[in-house]
């Protein structure tokens, strides 16, 4: 959840091992909109991830009114809403998120980019995004399961020779 600068881990109980899966994601925005009873202009695909064990595709979506929805796409290419009612989850807030009042050149809040990508390796959740430091491009490493301890954080400092200056948001 970039807006709140928080990472949520949701227990899906999706543990049945699968060898591989193929998905038809052509016009997936239209399929998602139809499943939600609206048009593609009223949904935003936030992220997609494949469960490495079950090979099921999960899609995080936001409706026009800002309501978050989690969908799954099974091997049969059928979209299903993932119920988040009474589900086990854990969360951790990202340290040093961008100031909510600061905006990019298009007027979007920088806080929406506190988490731009995630990966997982050797018990660590790896996060790239922006932070509130002078060189705001950051890379964070968070232990999982979440412990509540501060994550390791590094910022990227790049010198752009064409401009003759450091880039603070790369």
Region locations from a protein language model:
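Sequence/structural signature of beta-propeller domains
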Residues: 1-170
């Amino acid at each position: 959840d970039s807006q709140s600068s928080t990472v949520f881990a949701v227990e899906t109980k999706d543990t049945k091992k699968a060898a591989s899966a193929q998905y038809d994601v052509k016009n997936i925005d239209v399929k998602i909109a139809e499943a939600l009873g609206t048009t593609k202009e009223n949904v935003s695909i936030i992220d997609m991830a494949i469960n490495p064990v079950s090979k099921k595709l999960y899609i995080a979506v936001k409706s026009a009114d800002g309501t978050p929805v989690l969908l799954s796409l099974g091997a049969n290419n059928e979209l299903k809403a993932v119920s988040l009612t009474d589900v086990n989850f854990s969360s951790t807030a990202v340290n040093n998120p961008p100031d909510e009042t600061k905006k990019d050149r298009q007027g979007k809040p920088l806080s929406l980019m506190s988490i731009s990508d995630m990966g997982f390796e050797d018990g660590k959740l790896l996060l790239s995004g922006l932070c509130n430091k002078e060189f705001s491009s950051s890379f964070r490493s968070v232990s999982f399961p979440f412990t509540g301890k501060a994550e390791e954080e590094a910022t990227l400092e790049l010198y752009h020779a064409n401009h003759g200056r450091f880039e603070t948001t790369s």
